[in-house]
Amino acid sequence: MEIENSKKVVGSKQVRKAVTKGVAKRVYLAKDAEPHITRPIIEVCEQYGVGVEMIETMFDLGRACGIEVGTAAVALLKD
């Protein structure tokens, strides 16, 4: 998967910060994450024109990042 070998930030606060700074090229969100966490990220991604892709579970998203815990959000960073 593209996520593991890419430069990235993990976690909702870091993802929002990367999007607003203009350094995020794509955001991945877990479908099973709480809406109060994902909704603001989706809104800021729409505002800044960053694509969002949904991953089935927080655990799957964490594993795709090469970490052993779940995460709600990941942003791939521009080169």
Where are these regions (language model features)?
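Signal for well-folded cores of large energy- and translation-related assemblies
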Residues: 20-24, 42, 46, 66
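Acidic beta-strand-to-loop metal/phosphate-binding motif
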Residues: 26-30
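Feature captures the catalytic cores and cofactor-binding loops of soluble hydro-lyases/lyases
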Residues: 33-59
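Short, flexible micro-motifs
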Residues: 14, 25, 65, 69
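C-terminal structural segments of small proteins and small subunits
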Residues: 50-79
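Ribosome large-subunit tunnel/peptidyl-transferase-proximal elements
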Residues: 1-23, 34-39
